[in-house]
């Protein structure tokens, strides 16, 4: 296990020292994100996105990229009309999917939600919350006092919202 953790660092140092281009294939997203200058994300043999790790995480080109990169994955909420499916919460713009990273969602906001389950991870707490017909995952501090069944308010800045069309492509 320790060798598996040290190998990406060793390979990166070797690549920089030799100055050669290295193509490294992995199914481990964390490994790819931590080692790469550029990531080519494939889905069934098709390139979903080719970008720096930071761009891949911050500006996913598709819902596949959004849901594949990150732990927990980006929230992808269905939009019906101009609202999050089954709710009165405005989606912010015309789209089919609204996405936001779990760490971009904050507690104590305008969006009513019900905590359906929690995962206590020590420093972090992952809360799964029902918003209308959708489930929204929130990553917050492990000190947060939440319990399944509790009613909470959620919020996110418009700048962290990602919008995707019906085919899963990012809208500009």
Question: What would you call each of these model-derived segments?
Answer:
Residues 54, 58-116, 121, 125-146:
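ATPase nucleotide-binding modules
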Residues 86-88, 166-169:
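Detector for glycine-centered tight turns/loop "hinges" at secondary-structure junctions
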Residues 1-61:
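ABC ATPase nucleotide-binding domains
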Residues 48, 116, 171-172:
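Generic structural signal for well-ordered beta-strand positions
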Residues 40, 97-99, 153:
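Hydrophobic beta-strand signal
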Residues 159-167:
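Short, Lys/Arg- and Gly-enriched loop/turn segments at beta-strand edges
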